[in-house]
Amino acid sequence: MDFELGDRIRIEKDGNTYEGIVMPSNTDHIVVKMVSGYNAGVDPEGASITLLEKAGPKNAPKAKPDKAKGQKKLPKVTILSTGGTIASKVDYRTGAVTAQFSADDIVDAIPELTEIADINGRVLYNILSENMKAEYWTELAGAVAQEIENGADGIIIAHGTDTMMYSAAALSFMLKTPVPVVFVGSQRSADRPSSDNAMNAICATKVAVSDIAEVCVVMHDTTSDDRCAIHFGTKVRKMHTSRRDAFQSINSDPIGYIDHSTHKIETVLPFSKRDSQKLELKNTLEPKCSLVKFVPGANPDVLSYYIDSGYKGLVIEGTGLGHVSTDWIPNIKRATENGIPVIMTSQCISGRVCDRVYDTGRDILKAGAIEGEDMLPEVALVKLMWALGQSNDVDEIKEIMRSNIGHEMTDSTLK
């Protein structure tokens, strides 16, 4: 056949037409990634195949230094590109979505951004967000602080959605910011007609020039292209694998909303206003912490592994109000007696941990565990990593974990 992996072809068979990029496939079928983003496998026997465009690895876009620029009289906004779907297209070699594009490419694709702000771009990473690590959070927070010190009026962080809530939580603890720091992503790549990248990026840029001096996440609020929600970085969670409105505030309202057509921002909750606090960076983390999910019948030796392996902190995602089976309690006590903080959270996600209602919970507290209040388990993990990076004193770490640092705890839960 006169086509290769990565070429764009048209297949006509049995009255149907399939057009897309050739993906790796077995010998029996040709697999193409269509413009919709979905894959189609077609038996080539009896099919008419037309080569539309040659495209090989040599033509695949490469990450490059960023020189994105807007208009000089507008507020200065820096886009820090870390990769993810908002900065991705279909890879010409495999047909899969890869993170190869920079802030320059985002601005080229969405020129409306330059009407809102003087855009500068900087590539930090070009990775899919499942490859994020604690060391990257440390570098990212440092890069944000550097851009603010250099005069940026707002920061946008282009990030993959899968682990965005972890990164947003990390920066919420590591930074006090006088300007907006806005995480934004996309559930669907720019190649797809249903992509949410343009609207999300435009709304994020408007928030970046607003008075909301918080680390926040801006994503679709509904499945329609009507408005985006502005979430605190510590109260947001990805609640669906693929829907455009996957991000929701948990145990809290969003900070507010931004209308896509009017760009008007409506705030719901109090927030730190622009220039109300000085820039402060505390980006030391202790990566040797873990989030442990309890399930019925789970062997308590799971905790022994972490204790014996030298882990510095543990977050347990318990049932209901924050429970584990009674045979886990001795190992919780062993951990705390060895100076390892243990934080109890709930796999219910919504609601508040309270280990004073039932006997099991009371025994967990007697073993030295700390109630995680209404913190999301993932946020509690990141906060514990940060707390351990700030102090070696167990009592001080406990006090940090019980304190509301970056909106991660609410006085009362809504639902």
From Swiss-Prot:
Catalytic residues of the enzyme: T85, T161, D162, K238
PROSITE patterns, alphabetized: ASN_GLN_ASE_1 (PS00144), ASN_GLN_ASE_2 (PS00917), ASN_GLN_ASE_3 (PS51732)
Alphabetized InterPro entries for the sequence: AsnA_fam, Asp/glu_Ase-like_sf, Asparaginase/glutaminase-like, Asparaginase/glutaminase_AS1, Asparaginase/glutaminase_AS2, Asparaginase_C, GatD, GatD_N
One Gene Ontology molecular-function label: glutaminyl-tRNA synthase (glutamine-hydrolyzing) activity
Pfam families (UniProt xref): Asparaginase, Asparaginase_C, GatD_N
Asparaginase/glutaminase domain mapped to chain residues: 75-404
Enzyme Commission number: 6.3.5.-
Transmembrane helix listed as a keyword: no
GO aspect biological process, one term: amino acid metabolic process
Catalytic activity: L-glutamyl-tRNA(Gln) + L-glutamine + ATP + H2O = L-glutaminyl-tRNA(Gln) + L-glutamate + ADP + phosphate + H(+)
Enzyme class: ligase
Gene3D superfamilies from the UniProt entry: 2.30.30.520, 3.40.50.40, L-asparaginase, N-terminal domain
Family that this chain belongs to: Belongs to the asparaginase 1 family. GatD subfamily.
UniProt name for this protein: Glutamyl-tRNA(Gln) amidotransferase subunit D
Gene from which this protein is expressed: gatD
